[in-house]
């Protein structure tokens, strides 16, 4: 099997712009990518590919394959799948809470397709045993789309339910989950820039502007 990580560094995570500058966001997404790669390494996934429109922000110590693609997430992944002849794990680069144990469990299921849903109807991870028969459809409500595609292909399916694996870091409030539950480099980065505020409601982040230099 192989793992593939779609990745964007340049001007990434614009929804975090209220709390992180462009430079900070680009550094942050690289650290999240490193955490995802570590989870794959911990699960003993040997073959790891990165799909990206630019090699900017790829960790210097990454030993896998980097494929430069044209813009367009679905087109890039579908072209990759059409050329694949072994099971493929598609994992997003903004999942710093995913662990090696999650990966091992996901690839251990016997079903043809394993789907890890994300927040708001997204798809965080897809494990596809017959990738050249499958077409991804990210954006909008991709979780429903991928369930429907699997059904149309008459393939068996397993939904992997995990809070940590379903938590992608897109919005400022997601940083709270990273600080509470993370263990990797992205968490360390966040803790240097944010504090937490507790009260009667949910935990909120507070910006440590003097530490981050954010304006």
Swiss-Prot record:
InterPro entries: CofC, Nucleotide-diphossugar_trans. Its EC number is 2.7.7.68. The keyword Secreted does not apply. It comes from the Archaea. Pathway: Cofactor biosynthesis; coenzyme F420 biosynthesis. It is an enzyme of class 2 (transferase). One of its GO terms (molecular function) is phospholactate guanylyltransferase activity. One of its GO terms (biological process) is F420-0 metabolic process. Keywords: GTP-binding, Nucleotide-binding, Nucleotidyltransferase, Transferase. Gene3D superfamilies: 6.10.140.50, Spore Coat Polysaccharide Biosynthesis Protein SpsA, Chain A. It catalyses: (2S)-2-phospholactate + GTP + H(+) = (2S)-lactyl-2-diphospho-5'-guanosine + diphosphate. Pfam families: CofC. Coiled coil: none annotated. The keyword Ribonucleoprotein does not apply. Homodimer. Guanylyltransferase that catalyzes the activation of (2S)-2-phospholactate (2-PL) as (2S)-lactyl-2-diphospho-5'-guanosine, via the condensation of 2-PL with GTP. It is involved in the biosynthesis of coenzyme F420, a hydride carrier cofactor. Belongs to the CofC family. This is 2-phospho-L-lactate guanylyltransferase. It comes from Methanococcoides burtonii (strain DSM 6242 / NBRC 107633 / OCM 468 / ACE-M).
């Amino acid at each position: 099997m192989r793992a593939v990580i779609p990745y964007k560094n340049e001007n990434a995570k614009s929804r975090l712009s209220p709390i992180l500058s462009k430079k900070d966001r680009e550094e942050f997404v690289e650290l999240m990518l490193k955490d995802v790669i570590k989870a794959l390494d911990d699960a003993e996934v040997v073959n790891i590919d990165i799909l990206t429109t630019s090699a900017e922000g790829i960790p210097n110590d990454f030993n896998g394959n980097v494929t430069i693609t044209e813009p367009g997430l679905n087109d890039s992944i579908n072209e990759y799948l059409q050329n694949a002849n072994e099971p493929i794990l598609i994992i997003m680069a903004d999942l710093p809470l995913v662990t090696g144990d999650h990966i091992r469990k996901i690839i251990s299921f016997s079903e043809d397709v394993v789907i890890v849903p994300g927040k708001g109807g997204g798809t965080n991870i897809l494990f596809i045993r017959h990738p050249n028969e499958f077409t991804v459809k990210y954006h909008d409500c991709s979780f429903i789309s991928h369930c429907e595609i699997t059904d149309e292909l008459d393939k068996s399916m397993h939904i992997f339910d995990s809070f940590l694996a379903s938590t992608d870091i897109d919005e400022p409030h997601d940083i709270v989950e990273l600080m509470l539950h993370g263990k990797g480099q992205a968490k360390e980065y966040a803790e240097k820039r944010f504090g937490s505020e507790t009260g009667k409601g949910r935990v909120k982040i507070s910006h440590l502007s003097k530490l981050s230099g954010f304006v």
